[in-house]
């Protein structure tokens, strides 16, 4: 039963990361001033 909890935890974390990446890309597309520096770094990270 403990292993099942770990699987759920990993899936939730991965889902959050994917969602965060989507939001990040939207912000970069809109060219928000605050995110411009982070977006430059973000281009080097393969999502």
Swiss-Prot record:
Write out the entry's keywords from A to Z. Cell inner membrane, Cell membrane, Membrane, Repressor, Transcription, Transcription regulation, Transmembrane, Transmembrane helix
What topology does it adopt in the membrane? Single-pass membrane protein
List locations, semicolon-separated.
Answer: Cell inner membrane
GO cellular component labels: plasma membrane
GO biological process terms on file? cellular response to magnesium ion; negative regulation of phosphorelay signal transduction system; response to acidic pH
TM segments?
Answer: 6-26
Which residue intervals are topologically Cytoplasmic? 1-5
What is the protein name for this chain?
PhoP/PhoQ regulator MgrB
Source organism of this protein record: Escherichia coli (strain K12)
């Amino acid at each position: 039963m403990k292993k099942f909890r770990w699987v759920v935890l990993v899936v939730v974390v991965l889902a959050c990361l994917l969602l965060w990446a989507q939001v990040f890309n939207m912000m970069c597309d809109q060219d928000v001033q605050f995110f411009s520096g982070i977006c430059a770094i973000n281009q080097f990270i393969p999502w």
